[in-house]
Amino acid sequence: TRRRPAALLDNPECLITLRNEDDSLFGGIAPEPSSKNLEKVRKVLDESKSEFRLGAIFDPDGDRIRFYDGTREIDMNQFGALAFHYMATWRKEQGCVAKSVATSNFVNIIAEKLGVPVMETPVGFKNFRPWLSRNAKQKALVAFEESDGISGLNNTLEKDAQFGLLIALEIMAVTGKNLGEYLDALYEEYGRFYPTRSGFEVDKSLVGAPLKAKVDAIATIAKPGAKVMVGKNEKTVKQLLTLDGVKIIFEDDSWMLVRPSGTEPKVRIYTECRNPDEKDPMFEAAKALFFKN
């Protein structure tokens, strides 16, 4: 995929490519679209005076993508919601939106207001196939996961960084806004969301079924209506999802997801809050629920 974007876009003069040479060791860095790997893109765009700017990094096999617009990094939690809003409001496409249970609920809030159904799935892009297939009764306008994978309407069943890039460019061309400007407009209307991902190790004896059982037990003490202390605040459980681990959604639309690793003695925790000061308390509260049972 190194030279595919240039070919797709007919080699425009405004396109600058980085790291497109053959290198089986990837320059000694982890081959992924991470914040750290955006540094060279940031440098190029920060020096640009152009009105419209878009930077993107792919992983080597071209299935994941992350953006930078000259002002901020935009990950898939944000871009997926942004792309869905564009497809539903500017292009006026009909269908649903698909996302994994570990992905930001930013898109849920947008979809609810627009009257569009959300298909929330276990982690893993293969789970989006029922809404990406050509004969789907209800097609996903976009399907995305927090680990920077996206696909969508009339595209491949697999995550596709090039689809993400083309949608981003279309958004800019049609709306006349950089991605960050579009995102700010959504924040103004729907509020901000602060997702995080972390985890911790447990005793090796818990690997496999015992660890899954311990995580599943959280559902028995965090049912809808239950109270959970998050820092100094008491939150009320609004909804409980057990598609993949246990996801607890609170009345203020913040949430926590506790998932067991299937192969390692690790527990993965995903949280999202509406106030950045709650990031650490949310993680500690999720961890406390795991050790409570």
Regions picked out by a protein language model, each given a short descriptive name:
Residues T1-R192:
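Phosphate-binding chemistry for phosphorylated carbohydrates and sugar-nucleotides
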Residues K177-N293:
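Catalytic-core signal marking the mid-to-C-terminal active-site face
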